[in-house]
Curated annotation (Swiss-Prot):
Keywords: Cytoplasm, Methyltransferase, RNA-binding, rRNA processing, S-adenosyl-L-methionine, Transferase
CDD domains linked to this entry: AdoMet_MTases
Name of the protein in question: Ribosomal RNA small subunit methyltransferase A
EC number: 2.1.1.182
Gene name of the encoded protein: rsmA
Length: 270
């Protein structure tokens, strides 16, 4: 029988390292709750980034997935994870930097991602995975609360920005619940939150999303400017294009919906 999450880490003399942005979760009930809101189905193929002390890993494995692949860059955790594997042979362990691996490298046709992501690489991983959304069933992620609010933000709100647009064009986004700093060891300085992203059935092309990224970069660089001014250097976007698309050219970047940005991008590419 495996020891408790905290005791398991202690037996291996593992303490959190600040350079890796590590904050351990020892509360198994929280781990179970994260997996529960993911609606993970049996026989799914699952990916977890940064399993660390293995709390979330255990909760995922208890749902009997076909396989769980964990990617861990800190070699101190590998012996601990191998001990979990003795009880769950469907656990695959890869020692690697998650930023150096694409989903296609792992041979997935479909994968469910459940992770407590290190804060310092969370945004980059989310954007990268969204561009591989055709391979993803859903992503249930723990991130900084502020980042989750940006992902889920609606137009004309302070948190709304490029990340909101890109995420919502590719996935249905849902803020599930917040997590207090006291749930971690050591406690971080900020609140966290769980967000679930489920890729849409009709996904925009990568080329179209890339064009949206270019347009939103210009638009939100001057988010208080009128859209006709902030996009004036984006040659294809003339005022008549905005009129044709029924977009008020006196709007600011934060007033346009994700679909507005998609239409502008599509018009430029046509």
């Amino acid at each position: 029988m495996l020891p408790s999450i905290a005791k398991h880490a202690a037996l291996h003399h593992i303490n959190p390292l600040k350079k890796h942005g590590q904050n351990f979760i020892f509360d198994s009930s929280l781990c179970h709750k994260i997996v529960r809101v993911s609606n993970l189905e049996e026989n799914s193929r699952v990916l977890e980034i940064g399993p660390g002390s293995g709390g979330l890993t255990r909760s995922i494995l208890q749902k009997n997935p076909e396989s769980l692949t964990v990617i861990e860059t800190d070699e101190r955790f590998i012996p601990l994870l191998n001990e979990i594997k003795e009880y769950y042979p469907n656990l695959n362990i890869i020692k690697q930097d998650a930023l150096k691996i694409n989903l296609t490298d792992l041979g997935y046709d479909k994968v469910t991602i459940i992770s407590n992501l290190p804060y310092h690489i969370g945004t980059e991983l989310v954007i990268r995975w969204l561009k591989e959304a055709r391979l993803i069933t859903s992503m249930t992620l723990m991130l900084q609360k502020e980042l989750v609010e940006r992902i889920c933000a609606m137009p004309s709100t302070k948190a709304y920005g490029r990340l909101s647009v890109i995420c919502q064009l590719i996935a249905k986004v849902e803020k599930c619940f917040e997590v207090a700093p006291t749930a971690f060891y050591p406690p971080p300085k900020v609140y966290s939150a769980i967000v679930k992203l489920t890729p849409l059935e009709n996904l925009p092309s990568i080329a179209l999303i890339t064009k949206v990224e270019q347009i939103t970069k210009l638009a939100f660089a001057g988010r208080r400017k009128m859209i006709k001014s902030s996009l004036k250097n984006f040659v294809p976007v003339k005022n008549e294009v905005l009129t044709q698309l029924n977009i008020n050219d006196n709007y600011r970047a934060e007033n346009l919906t994700p679909q507005d940005y998609l239409m502008i991008a599509a018009c430029e590419m046509s």
